[in-house]
Amino acid sequence: METVYFNGKFITKEEVKISPDDRGFLFADGVYEVVRWYQGFFYDLNGHMTRLKRSLRELRINWTDTDSFPDFAEKLIKINSLENQTAMVYLQVTRGAARRSHNFPKPDVLPTVYAYAWGFLPEVKLKETGIKAMLKEDIRWSRCDIKSVALLPNTLSFQEAHENGLKECIFVRNGLITEGSHSNIFFVINGTLYTHPESNYVLSGITRKNILRIAEDCGIKIREEAVEENRLRFVQEAFISNTSAEVMPVTELGGNTIGDGVPGPVTRIISDKFDNEINSLKG
Ligand code: PDD
């Protein structure tokens, strides 16, 4: 039986009751985080906590128990017997339930907090072959830096990719490549690693941040600079990053083969270093 966390309690999923007046349901008025458990620890939980607090602050959601997340996330892993597996924890915090009105509830209502854990098998094979992705105009709002649950542009775009047998949809805003529907994207051009700078047009991925640190440690030249769509023909390598896929090579983008159509050397170095770091943390 699956045990989840709901408003301070560990209960079965069936026991969860969320009001139809919940602003998460009515307005997508909430934030989320996804953290990964590597058979014994959460990777960069501090990074996720910092981003969670920032998202809550930006939406002015006052969840006073934010610091309880690391503890109940680990409890969720243990209660569901996932300690020795690769697993994820999803957390969602909404502004809470109040009669539908565009202004925030006055006085404040308690936020609704829901989290659950699940085990999964990493996509090892895809890392060897790389993935194909589509390109599409970035139809999202201009606060992509907030990890909000308002993900309709992302899900619509990802669905389009999925229906075309592609593994991600990469967005282009004003001719510049921003990020994917649920990932950041990196390019290698003449040995330099490019990714969109932190801004309101991309989510500051925790994996992105750690990849930049690892690449710097390896002496790889880095430019946090958006790549123009029309420079794609000069790109030798591409990869996406997120908590579940880590470093995932992209071998075809928008119908164009990237480099030799196989994961490139810089991608491999970064991916291997990332794996090494995880293994050393496993101890
Ligand atoms: N998504 N950009 C977007 C739009 C994302 O949704 C995500 C993650 C990322 C990568 O962030 P991180 O490295 O912190 O996972 C970038 C998660 C995995 C999701 O929505 O399930």
Kindly label every feature range from the protein language model.
Residues 1-169, 173-176, 199, 212-283:
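Conserved alpha/beta cores of soluble small-molecule-handling proteins
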Residues 176-198, 204:
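Glycine- and Gly-Pro-enriched alpha-helical subdomains that act as flexible
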Residues 205-210:
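Feature captures the catalytic cores and cofactor-binding loops of soluble hydro-lyases/lyases
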